[in-house]
Amino acid sequence: KIWLEILPSQIGKPFFFSYNVPRSIGERGLYGSQMGSSKLVEFQKVGNQVQLIAKNTQFFAKEGTPQAQFVSESFSDSLMSSTAMVSQPHPETKSILIEANSLLFTDIPGYQTRLEASFRMPFALDTRNTSFTSTKNTSALTGLEVKAHFAVSKLSAPPMTSSIVPATPPPSATPDPRSMFVSFYYSLMPLPEPMQTRLADERVGFFTVARTDFTTDAKIKSKTHYLERWRLEKKDPSAAISEPKEPIVYWLDKNIPEQYRATVTAGVLEWNKAFEKAGFKNALVVKQQQVTDDFNNMDARHASIRWFTGADVGFAIGPRRSDPRTGEILDADIGMSDGFTRSARRILVDDLARPRGPDGEMCEEAETSAQELHYALDLLEARGLELDGPEADALAKAYLKRTIMHEVGHTIGLRHNFRASTLNDLKKIHDAEFTKVNGMSSSIMDYLPFNIAPKGEKQGEYVMSTIGAYDYWAVEFGYKQFPLGQEEIGLNQILAKSSQRELQYDTDEDAGYGSVIGIDPNVNRFDMGSDPLAYYKLRMKLSRELWDRLQNMNLATGESYERLTRSFRSGFAQVANAAPLAAKYIGGVYTRRERAGSSRPLFEPVDAAKQRDALALITK
């Protein structure tokens, strides 16, 4: 058993509480090396019980006012867990002991619901076979890793008769589908002094924390959105460019294959270009965790990059956790599937799990990105690329760097920008000297396809190798420091540039989700060039080239047709992806994020000739 000592000064004191998932079962969205959620919590003593309470930080009013009283009466906190005291107060310190086992051997993460959603089976936490695997306690952090056992007593018998509704299969990646272990790393640490907040603006894409202030009814809008961002302060506030007092440190986990560590490091440090323009030199630092290091990268004190894998996985994700009072980012952990760097033949295009996340909270490149990689390598292999040769290795590392840059962007607070890919025309994106400096797109935060030129034409970079103009601008808006009393003026000067083409922004809600597509044909995932319709035509042309080459491919005697079938399907997937995006032109509307006083309209219908061109493409 493990006991926690709680001092009287720690009762009613706010703490940052989070959980991460170091180990899971490796299928259907349940993977290891994933971040969980976080809360602002307090320990509260009720009789002999000590409760772990998640405080409601969404709604507040100034302490001591009548408004603060009615807010506390109107909205509830939440009980995360509770346990009985196991000691009398210490005679000198007055501290008490509680049993960590009974406090944390509960389903605080709500993983039973996730298991039920994935398998439609009533898995329950088995506390008798749940245990602690590691603990860490310092003045800055208390960390405990729980190896939780989830089980179900029996599997459902198959139906006696066939059904038009297919049954959800049980787990297939565990030796026995009735039993599985999942690890949770719980972190509890003191909150920092509140950081100075910065108000969000809809013209720049940052993740935000929202708080509703009921102190006064004079405001039309009581809800305020603060940027999620790291605390960066200059060592020399008077210098135009200064190193920060505390840089943002990314720890490379010791589970990253050695041949990819330099590429991952390069992807992280690429963002220092933007931070230097915003006034910070060496804002981002990369450190390698050694085998002898005794800390866990899954704790809340270390921003990290980790590898993971699974039976059906091929995605990367870059979430972050912030102080709900101010938006200060306190932790971030990038999870990188080895499917991004392994051979394209390893990627399971047919049945990839789809990470879920409302309003762009999670990076959802999984299925389409894997299809895109498979398609690109199919076509390049058909043109003569050797998948086990140096050119393919360089391509895989370039793709890895691009992915790391994208995910690091999320961990510094940036949302997707799905308008960014329309900045340059199709000719410009094959000018390698230009794109190495400026990027193919105005932002790495777009979902960008492989840049493949038509047969016989000039080939530029296959993937984006640096950050774009929008990325520099967004970092400047989020992180630039100003002299006392000058912040509002300085931020407005930055925002005044938002109408410039290379700085325009639209995100997940604008591009649409699932079967619901947006109204602006220039805001899409996986398009490229200033004329998306021309790009869709190019992709269809490339698919026809792939099919023609596959027609003449000779398989070795005894070789399976599966490889050929999958390659044909990757070409058809391009057509399937292009058709609904081309349909956005028909009845489509170009949108703009403008403020009152602008001469540019907020909405502009797509030209009729362009609509007819799109219709002709779809109906061919």
Kindly give the residue locations of the regions a language model identified.
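Conserved catalytic/binding loops enriched for acidic/polar residues
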Residues: 390-391, 395, 420-620
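Extended catalytic-interface subdomain
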Residues: 328-347, 358-365, 404, 409, ...
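The catalytic-center signature of Zn2+-dependent metalloproteases
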Residues: 288-308, 398-454
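Sec-exported extracytoplasmic/periplasmic mature domains
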Residues: 269-280, 310, 410, 414, ...
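Solvent-exposed, polar/charged alpha-helical surfaces in well-ordered, non-transmembrane soluble domains
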Residues: 262-269, 273, 398, 402, ...
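Short secondary-structure junctions and interdomain/linker hinges
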Residues: 86, 237, 278, 312, ...
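Auxiliary tRNA-acceptor-end handling modules of aminoacyl-tRNA synthetases
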Residues: 1-256, 274, 278, 283, ...
